[in-house]
Structure formats: structure tokens, C-alpha cells
Amino acid sequence: MLTPPRTVVRRDGGLYALERALQRRGFRHVAGADEAGRGACAGPLVAAAAVLPEGRRGEIDGLADSKLLTPASRERVYAEVVARALAYAVVVIPAAEVDLRGLHVCNLAAMRRALASLATAPEYVLTDGFGVDGLDVPGLAVWKGDRVAACVAAASVLAKVTRDRIMVELDTTFPGYGFAEHKGYITAEHSAALRERGPCPEHRFSYVNVATVSGRRGAPPRARRPLVVGLDEPMERSGAVEGTVGVALGERPWAAVSVGNDVAMEGGM
């Protein structure tokens, strides 16, 4: 295994500086991983990983942290990442799985599965914010990594666009909550709809605001969801909504499945 680099890279060196430094040290395939939906109280948690080509082939015009891009810009950059990445993978974790296993456990498992699903095996991994254990290659957790590493920014766009598309679908299936607008995050409109309608199956009952309106605030976090499936039972059997990982490739959407038995959307050059 190659020795991790000791090169000092300035945070203001540009979006590609960190990957270029790693590649100069011999790590040709640098993967970035990020997620979308941690702070939402409804909808899935989505993790993505991406490996961009070396040099100018890996430079994508307008690439940035997905949160800094307009919806139209995200869609354009998403298409560029899908077309030009050496490899990419997206994993979708349903809200019920987040309730059963816990947010951080699902976050780590989803990022780990996305990285393991890459068609091009990474030689070094960059993650946004916190490290991911259980990898066979060296890695680095980078604070605000989606703003300083191109591969992490690419992963953030993949995760964000995939999740936003799912929330638009859920808005049709569960009208009245405004999912297409706020994407499952807490807003005044969302809170008012929760109080008026109560939660739907796509809400995260382990979150205090959802548990409160459902009348289950006093129950332990993992016991708040009314219908609990077994940990080893695929989530498609629990009535989870279809419309997750395959849609971005123009394929028929697949049902969301559990961390232990998930299906990743894979692709690349």
C-alpha cells in the first residue's frame, strides 16, 4: 500500500489542488464521498461516491458544493459528472431504515457501500466532514470537503440531485406536505402540515418534531415508527415508495432497500 502523502495543501488552492497533490504522490484514483438528507425529517438519506479522471479531463465547469448551486446548475453539473466520471455510485437509505438503525450508522454504511460499489477501485478516499471506517485504502476526512475537493463536490451533487428527484416523486405520492419545495427539511410550511395532517410513512419517526406530532415522543427512538420491519427484511416489503436509485440513468426506478441489502446505482466511463 502506498504511503499517505505528507504534502501541505492550502485550502484556498482551488477545488482540484488536493486531488492533484494526492495524484502526484501516486494515488491516481481518488474517490470522494458525501451525503444528502442528514438534516431532513422526511425522505431518504442518500450517499454518493465518485472518481474523476486525472488532469483536465476531470475538470467540470461549474462544479461546486451542491448547496452553493442553483437547482438548474446542479442538474447540469450532475449530467457532466455522470458523463465524465471514471466511476460513480449512489446509495439510497429509506426513512424507515434511518429510524431502525440510527442516522449516523446509516450514513457511514451508505458511504461505505457507495465506495465499495465503484467500478474503478479507489486508491485514496476523501470524505466530507468525518471519516468512514472499514475501508481497505487510506483516506482523509476533510472539513467542508465538498468545497475543497472536486471528487467530494461531485459526490455531493450526485447525492443532492438524486434525493431532490425522490422528494419530488414523494410530493405526488404524499401531497400536502410540500416535499417538492422543502425536500423534507424543517420549514414553517412543513411543520404546519405535520401538525395538521400528522406524519406520513416517509417521515422519520426518530426525529423529535415528528415523534411529537405522532404522539410517540415518550417512546425510545427506534420504537416510534408505527410499523417496524425486521432488520434483515428488505425495505421494499415494508411498502417503501418506489423511485430511487435507477432514475438518474434513465432506468426504471427501483424500490429502496436496506443498508444490509441495498442496490447501488453505478456508472462511469
Swiss-Prot record:
This is Ribonuclease HII. Keywords: Cytoplasm, Endonuclease, Hydrolase, Manganese, Metal-binding, Nuclease. One of its GO terms (biological process) is DNA replication, removal of RNA primer. Residues 28-222 form the RNase H type-2 domain. Disulfide bonds: none annotated. InterPro entries: RNase_HII (IPR022898), RNase_HII/HIII (IPR001352), RNase_HII/HIII_dom (IPR024567), RNaseH-like_sf (IPR012337), RNaseH_sf (IPR036397). The gene is rnhB. Its cofactor is Mn(2+); Mg(2+).
